[in-house]
Amino acid sequence: MAKTEMYQPPLGNRALFKMSIPGSKSLTNRHLIIAAIASGETTIHNLLESRDTNLMIEGLRRIGCKIEKLNHTGTHDTGVISPHCTCLNDLIQPSDVRIIPSKHYTCSTKIDCGLAGTVMRFLPVLAGLCKGSVEFFGDDQAIRRPMDGTLHALRKLGVQVDGDRIPFTVHGRGEIEGGALETTEHSSSQFISGLLLSACRFKNGLTLKHIGNPLPSRPYIDMTVEVMREWGINVTHSDGVWAVTPKELTGKHITIEPDLSNAAPFMIGAIVTGGSATIQNWPSKTSQPGKYLEAILPQFGAEITKTANTITVSGTGNITGIRADLGHIGELVPNLVALATLAETPSVFYNIGHIRYHETDRIEALVNEISSLGGTITAGKDYIKITPTTLTRSGVWKTYKDHRMATSGAIIGLRHKLTIEDIECTSKTFPRFADLWSGAFGK
């Protein structure tokens, strides 16, 4: 599909398909950061090519890290195979890259963060290890994304920072002393991950203590810790305290898992249509928060079967609403709200206040769009309640430049006629999403 501003999802077709999902954005950008502070070359296989990962790669290049694209080898191509469409198999070719880090980074540059939280919260810490000034800027909506956790922490670590939100400038001195640090920030787990990922290059390592309100999306911090240990970094965690010791890292060969969060709309779409979707290369063990789909979707009435490397989700014809604490999996909330909108009984999702600070205020956006279709949805500071009703109005589903809002509109569009504005915002994490969606759910 050529770039398009408007997209009308296929309506009312029972889905029966198999597909492979592109590599995980969250894993890709974590491995890229660590590869940039290692000694020696690293190769990353099945790297996701999307706006967020391209911004990370370009940011690393701008501070002096050499990154080369290699000829892709392997079988983790992305595509859909369904009874009516086999032409989309191998639609998206993943990438293999070689990262050649610099021993000492010296630079004076500008880095575009777009709307990528991993870029704006991971790279500034690495910039603090550089000798020179790095200015960070981004999309218009980036200014509303909280940055206090990262920038206040850098200041406490002795790094000069001008500004409190996008745009801001980090003035690195070539090293960070490290040591003990306390933080009370709780609007995003990425603040913790960003500090941990580069901490083995701090002169004295890092002992990071979080106090105050619970952190959201804790599985993403667990993912960070697992990635660090994969690289041989000594990191421990106990009672809200993470400790990282200094270490010189060697290069590695890394293979990126499929992005399980990007599988969510396709799995949910199968439930909505009463069909069946098989996701290939599903890991048997993973740190990705998308793994919780295995437990959550059956609560809505889905049937799930697994093999050694696949998962199949089938709709039963009935969708039951649920009450659930989704604080640990905020990225999945918009798609689950879309599913709940099409259920037969009410749903309540709580402890999700942090998703107000994602690419857009996702709680407000979901209330606005579902209400505009005639749905019944209410919200508070940190919860959403959906009372299923017949959607009575067609119209344009606004995405707010948010990829999860776009995929949520696509789910509802399987049952109710609508047009999605700016479907290409999905390229943030899932290039050519609309082509794959039409292939999976079209006639």
UniProtKB/Swiss-Prot annotation:
Principal EC category: transferase
Please give the CDD domains that the UniProt record associates with this protein.
Answer: EPSP_synthase
Please describe what this protein does.
Catalyzes the transfer of the enolpyruvyl moiety of phosphoenolpyruvate (PEP) to the 5-hydroxyl of shikimate-3-phosphate (S3P) to produce enolpyruvyl shikimate-3-phosphate and inorganic phosphate.
> Binding positions for 3-phosphoshikimate?
25-26, 30, 188-190, 217, 331, 358
Q: Which domain of life is it from?
A: Bacteria
Where mainly found? cytoplasm
The UniProt entry's sequence similarity note says: Belongs to the EPSP synthase family.
Q: Whose protein is this, by species?
A: Tropheryma whipplei (strain TW08/27)
GO CC annotations, alphabetized: cytoplasm
Positions contributing to phosphoenolpyruvate binding:
25, 117, 145, 190, 362, 404, 428
Q: Which InterPro entries match?
A: Enolpyruvate_Tfrase_dom (IPR001986), Enolpyruvate_Tfrase_sf (IPR036968), EPSP_synthase (IPR006264), EPSP_synthase_CS (IPR023193), RNA3'P_cycl/enolpyr_Trfase_a/b (IPR013792)
**Gene of origin?**
aroA
TM spans, by residue?
A: none
Question: What name goes with this protein?
Answer: 3-phosphoshikimate 1-carboxyvinyltransferase
Question: Which key words tag this protein in UniProt?
Answer: Amino-acid biosynthesis, Aromatic amino acid biosynthesis, Cytoplasm, Transferase
One GO BP annotation of this record: aromatic amino acid family biosynthetic process
Spell out the Pfam families in the cross-references: EPSP_synthase
NCBIfam families of this UniProt entry? aroA
Q: Which reaction does it catalyse?
A: 3-phosphoshikimate + phosphoenolpyruvate = 5-O-(1-carboxyvinyl)-3-phosphoshikimate + phosphate
Gene Ontology molecular-function annotations? 3-phosphoshikimate 1-carboxyvinyltransferase activity
Q: Where in the cell is it found?
A: Cytoplasm
Chain segments annotated as coiled-coil in the UniProt record: none
**Pathway(s) where this gene product acts:** Metabolic intermediate biosynthesis; chorismate biosynthesis; chorismate from D-erythrose 4-phosphate and phosphoenolpyruvate: step 6/7
